[in-house]
Design a protein with these regions (language model features):
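Conserved Class I SAM-dependent methyltransferase catalytic core
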Residues: 11, 18, 27-40, 233, ...
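Extended hydrophobic-aromatic, low-complexity segments
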Residues: 279-283, 323-324, 333-337, 353, ...
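Short, surface-exposed amphipathic charged segments that create phosphate/polyanion-binding patches used
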Residues: 266-268, 366-373, 414-420
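Conserved S-adenosyl-L-methionine
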Residues: 168-272, 277-287, 292-296, 327-328, ...
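Feature representing long, continuous alpha-helical segments
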Residues: 205, 234, 272-274, 306-310, ...
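Short, contiguous acidic/charged loop-to-helix segments that flank catalytic cores in large enzymes
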Residues: 22, 281-303, 328-336, 357-363, ...
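Accessory, often C-terminal, charged low-complexity segments
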Residues: 276-298, 305, 338, 343-346, ...
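Non-catalytic, mostly N-terminal accessory regions of nucleic-acid modification and defense proteins
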Residues: 1-189, 248-261, 355-358, 382-388, ...
């Protein structure tokens, strides 16, 4: 079971919940996290200010360079937490908070576009409720850097907000266990890391934690990302700033397809959780000759899944690796998607397809797929975190894995992949990749199977793992996609018959002079 949150975190959440009735629940995160950022930045500023005074004297305490050199934001007087708390009970406290955030952003170019603009004044929150929230945030000791209290609280809130918002919301957040799994598989120790739909920046945060955990050097990782939603773009910038992580998220929040902020980027690692089954993502005559589709069919307007895949492929460097999530339908879609999928397989880009357990996500209860693409599946030696890894040639092979039997209960109806679950998956994947895999890897019924190109071609280039992995349990070996398509066709026929019968009945009544209006 997941560990329970600390009383401090719970108290902060309950304080945020007091906003109920004043603002929409979907706004909680923006109200709370911006204030939390203000408290954090102010505490760091005051600590640095005291250190400068002790080392260099009072006359240097307002020289901005003495702050920025240590990744500390310089705060003008009206932006400091002490000033906010002195005025917490005043009727114009919302305006003072807006002014504080504005002046911080103006004084620190790295925060351009990160903080909300005139936000608290527009919300019109009751002064007493806002003061209560400020009091709760004021109790947080942000000096506890050893235990990463800042990151922990921020992460707790992002997850809690995603849980509270539930289906159809919370797209800004990918559960930590999934991000950790992707990082453990693609191992982004050094080079360029890119996320084309970065949400609140969780992929970046967990990737750098992975590097730290394995005694790597975070400075060797350059981060690039893009986010479409303006409020989530700001969340990402704050989330990264809180941890002192430098990142290029583009000039502004923007649509990755129509306003690519990193057109010439070639990334060594790509991690992504794109919106599932995004419809009408481009107009019929839009992006038809986009260079990202070069060598492939143009992805259909009805579903963006393969648009995301080809965007990712176009960004991979010569030895680039990508790990991203998609709805299961992308494994076996027909028509244009099948043509694109076949070409991806023929081009030796698909490395692994991993079905995840249901109920991992806060936004959907369906099972989703983790895709691993690799630009270079040839035999070679690679230096990773000070160790030389010898990879075998895997050009005409794809590893299929099924994790639906994994996961432990988490937050009532959800599950999470445990550390031991992730370790098993990563060990299996890396054993399959590496030289001498015949001794370390084997196909395991109901878990994994290494399929040849010929096997995949024989099955019509479907990437549904259950078509390859051996299942003893007959329910698991059921071709879910084929069954669902059959049911879909049957239901469509029944609905068509119903519509015809309804039309015939209405016509009879009309002819009798008793027209029924529907």
């Amino acid at each position: 079971m997941a560990k329970k949150s600390t009383p401090m975190e719970e108290a902060l959440w309950k304080s945020a919940d007091k906003l109920r009735g004043s603002v929409e629940p979907a706004e909680y995160k923006h109200v709370v996290l911006s204030l939390f950022f203000l408290k954090f930045a102010s505490d760091k500023f005051e600590t640095q200010r005291r250190m400068i005074a002790q080392k260099h004297g009072e006359k240097f305490i307002d020289i901005i360079a003495f702050y920025t050199k240590d990744n500390v934001f310089y705060l003008p007087a009206a932006s400091r937490w002490s000033y906010i708390m002195e005025n917490a009970k005043q009727d114009d406290i919302a305006l003072k908070i807006d002014t504080a955030l504005y002046t911080i952003e103006k004084a620190n170019p790295a925060l351009k576009g990160a903080l909300p603009d005139n936000y608290y004044s527009r919300l019109g929150i009751d002064t007493s409720k806002l003061a209560s929230l400020l009091d709760e945030i004021n109790r947080i000791n942000t000096d506890d850097s050893e235990n990463d209290i800042i990151g922990r609280v921020y992460e707790y809130f992002l997850g809690k907000f995603a849980l509270a918002e539930g289906k159809g919301k919370g797209e800004f957040y990918t559960p930590k266990c999934i991000v950790n799994l992707i990082a453990e598989l693609i191992e982004p120790y050094d080079g360029t890391l890119y996320d084309p739909c970065c949400g609140s920046g969780g992929m970046f945060v967990q990737s750098l934690k992975f590097v730290e955990t394995h005694s790597g050097n975070k400075r060797k990782v350059s981060i690039y990302g893009q986010e479409y939603t303006s409020t989530t773009f700001k969340l990402a910038k704050m989330n990264l700033a809180i941890r002192g992580i430098s990142a290029n998220l583009g000039e502004t929040a923007a649509n990755t397809f129509t306003n690519d902020q990193h057109k010439d980027l070639k990334a060594d690692y790509i991690m992504a959780n794109p919106p599932f089954n995004q419809k009408e993502w481009r107009a019929d005559d839009e992006l038809t000759d986009d260079p990202r589709w070069s060598g492939y069919e143009v992805p259909p307007t009805s579903n963006a899944n393969y648009g995301w895949i080809l965007n990712i492929v176009s960004k991979l460097s010569q030895n680039g690796v990508a790990g991203f999530l998609l709805a299961n339908g992308a494994l076996s879609d027909d028509g244009t998607e099948l043509k694109i999928r076949r070409r991806l397989i023929e081009n030796n880009l698909v490395e692994a397809i991993i079905i995840l357990p249901r109920n991992l996500f806060y936004t959907t209860d369906i099972s989703v797929t983790l895709w691993i693409l690799n630009r270079n599946k040839k035999a070679r030696d690679v230096e990773k975190n000070g160790e030389t890894i010898r990879y075998r040639g895997r050009e005409r092979e794809i590893l299929f894995m099924d994790l639906r039997q994994m996961g432990s209960p988490f937050e009532k109806k959800y599950v999470e992949l445990t550390e031991s679950d992730r370790a098993k998956v990563a060990a299996t994947y890396h054993a399959w990749q590496r030289d001498g895999h015949g001794d370390a890897y084997r196909n395991i019924p109901e878990f994994c199977y290494s399929a040849s190109f010929d096997e995949v071609a024989e099955k019509g280039f479907t990437l549904v793992p259950s078509r390859y992995i051996e299942f003893i349990n007959r329910d698991e070996t059921l071709d879910f996609d084929t069954k669902m398509k059959s049911l879909q066709a049957e239901l469509q026929g029944l609905l068509s018959e119903e519509e015809k019968s309804k039309a015939d009945l209405l016509e009879v009544f009309r002819e009798l002079g008793y027209e029924i209006k529907v």
